UniProtKB/Swiss-Prot annotation:
Miscellaneous section: The basic functional RuBisCO is composed of a large chain homodimer in a 'head-to-tail' conformation. In form I RuBisCO this homodimer is arranged in a barrel-like tetramer with the small subunits forming a tetrameric 'cap' on each end of the 'barrel'.
Protein species of origin: Lavandula lanata
Origin: domain of life: Eukaryota
UniProt-annotated binding residues for substrate: 123, 173, 177, 295, 327, 379
Protein name: Ribulose bisphosphate carboxylase large chain
Record field: catalytic activity: 2 (2R)-3-phosphoglycerate + 2 H(+) = D-ribulose 1,5-bisphosphate + CO2 + H2O; D-ribulose 1,5-bisphosphate + O2 = 2-phosphoglycolate + (2R)-3-phosphoglycerate + 2 H(+)
GO CC terms of this entry: chloroplast
Length: 473
């Protein structure tokens, strides 16, 4: 058939390339309650109009490709295409725009974070017409949320399992993160739990290495949990990292944890992947295990201000995929995190309904329609002097996790745990009495030092430790 010969299917079809904005930029579009809405920070290449850049994002993340294809006529593009419906310049930034894109719900497989991200961010970030692209926020409609199980248990169920109310939970990451034998590792777990912590934790890269195979670690940690529970009368846990090279191996480790009767397991959800995470979350709900989530690799995705994906999007995705805890930054420790922005995505993790608030980075009102909440975990370079600020910032429904801030105590692990527990109890009591933790925090800690030599020793060691660096560009 010669190139000039028309077929029946090509009647009305005009081959060639046309501007994306002619099809995918629709400023008159009124969004639907069932649409997934995305806010992209777009930096076009020189000479590319923002309308064309926004339309290109909508096209390449939905039904579009670089040229017109005759099979467009075999479906309804108006029904399935993404639409760039609004564009705002970013104040104070040259040639940056917030482009809002609406996606019809039919584009996405039910209950699949993997498919949602494959569509929205899977291909478009390498598009040549863009110098940079960042997904700032997503609005997940209730109709789509209802296709997900979400967290295995949620905040209230975890409180009931631990029988612990009215205060933040305390944790500790065992250090050194790599190199300990399973028996010595279990010893450190016992000492920290016995000293007053609620949880201890495998670090993100503790899986099953030659110096400590996973089964040995699970056994010694279970022994530490039961021994500390018997001696304190409190329910304890250790985040046993079930992350593995295959989904089958991951589930096998979770099964063994359940057989040991421990309360919680752990997963590295970004390196492990959303499909694996959702599978593990379903197993945990069915078998009564809490699920702690580590966000290892997140800064590769979210740290650049004009390219990648903001952590609030990863946090929303985790709430859909499933996890009872997730690391959220500290605001005050060694890892980056602005207070208002951090509290914005903390609310998105915990609350059932969150109003749009651009000052906190929340681009859309989000209704979670009773999907269980996720407890934020503050971790990274924190110590007893930070306790008042952490208690005031994160409130009761949080885990405050001190690794070096426990194990680095000059008297050893148990006094380190005691110091953190005393500092927390002092801050909670002061708050309940109506004192201002932000203004009186240091005084509250100093008062508690008078009747806790363990806390006094910790305060002396870390009194000058700060992590203050200029904000990133």
């Amino acid at each position: 058939m010669s190139p000039q010969t028309e077929t029946k299917a090509s009647v009305g079809f005009k081959a060639g390339v046309k501007e994306y904005k002619l099809t995918y930029y629709t400023p008159e579009y009124e969004t639907k309650d069932t649409d997934i809405l995305a806010a992209f920070r777009v930096t076009p290449q020189p000479g590319v109009p923002p309308q064309e850049a926004g339309a290109a994002v909508a096209a390449e993340s939905s039904t579009g490709t670089w040229t017109t294809v005759w099979t467009d006529g075999l479906t309804s593009l108006d029904r399935y295409k993404g639409r760039c419906y609004n564009i705002e310049p970013v104040p104070g930034e040259k040639d940056q725009y917030i482009c809002y894109v609406a996606y019809p719900l039919d584009l996405f497989e039910e209950g699949s974070v993997t498919n949602m991200f494959t569509s929205i961010v899977g291909n478009v970030f390498g598009f040549k017409a863009l110098r940079a692209l960042r997904l700032e926020d997503l609005r997940i409609p209730p109709a789509y949320i209802k296709t997900f199980q979400g967290p295995p248990h949620g905040i209230q169920v975890e409180r009931d399992k631990l029988n612990t109310y009215g205060r933040p939970l305390l944790g500790c990451t065992i250090k050194p993160k790599l190199g300990l034998s399973a028996k010595n590792y279990g010893r450190a777990v016992y000492e920290c739990l016995r000293g007053g912590l609620d949880f201890t934790k495998d670090d993100e890269n503790v899986n099953s290495q030659p110096f400590m195979r996973w089964r040995d670690r699970f056994l010694f940690c279970a022994e530490a949990i039961y021994k500390s529970q018997a001696e304190t009368g409190e329910i304890k846990g250790h985040y046993l990292n079930a992350t593995a090279g295959t989904c089958e191996e991951m589930i096998k480790r979770a099964v063994f944890a359940r057989e040991l009767g421990v309360p919680i397991v752990m997963h590295d959800y970004l390196t492990g992947g959303f499909t694996a995470n959702t599978s593990l979350s379903h197993y945990c709900r069915d078998n009564g295990l809490l699920l702690h989530i580590h966000r290892a690799m997140h800064a590769v995705i979210d740290r650049q201000k004009n390219h990648g994906m903001h952590f609030r999007v990863l946090a929303k995705a985790l709430r859909l995929s499933g996890g009872d805890h997730i690391h959220s930054g500290t605001v005050v420790g060694k890892l980056e995190g602005e207070r208002d922005i951090t509290l914005g995505f903390v609310d998105l993790l915990r609350d059932d309904f969150v109003e749009k608030d651009r000052s906190r980075g929340i681009y859309f009102t989000q209704d979670w329609v009773s999907l269980p909440g996720v407890i934020p975990v503050a971790s990274g370079g924190i110590h007893v002097w930070h306790m008042p600020a952490l208690t005031e910032i994160f409130g009761d429904d949080s885990v405050l996790q001190f690794g070096g801030g426990t194990l680095g105590h000059p008297w050893g692990n148990p006094p380190g745990a005691v110091a953190n527990r005393v500092a927390l109890e002092a801050c909670v009591q002061a708050r309940n009495e109506g004192r201002d933790l932000a203004a009186e925090g240091n005084a509250i800690i100093r008062e508690a030092c008078k009747w806790s030599p363990e806390l006094a020793a910790a305060c002396e060691v870390w009194k000058e430790i700060k992590f203050e660096f200029p904000a990133m560009d």
